[in-house]
Amino acid sequence: MAEPSVLQKKTEIFLERDIYPLLKNFPASEKFSLCQEIKQSCYKLIRAAVMANNLTNVNRRLMWLDEADAEKTLLLVLLGVAKNQKYICLLYTSP
């Protein structure tokens, strides 16, 4: 088994440190819709990073990296929707 890639590690940290705390503030009506979609997108991003890291075939690796990029774009769209609905406010404070 290959060592976890930087993308995989950073996505896991992003999910734990940033996404989960944001999702706690969602209204109950959105817990099983937009909230769930955001979590699923993060999981798919991690999965794509793991798959790309464990493959040796360059073409298949690029396919999984393209999928990771698409999931990242979807995640940005979903977070934008949440921000527009005022479920979250994206204020970044450095640790």
Question: Where are each of the predicted segments found?
Answer:
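Conserved small/polar residues in nucleotide/adenosyl-binding loops
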Residues: Y92-P95
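Helix-loop segments that flank and shape redox-cofactor active sites
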Residues: R17-K31, M51-N59
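Amphipathic alpha-helices that form helix-helix packing interfaces
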Residues: F14-L15, I19-L22, S41, L45, ...
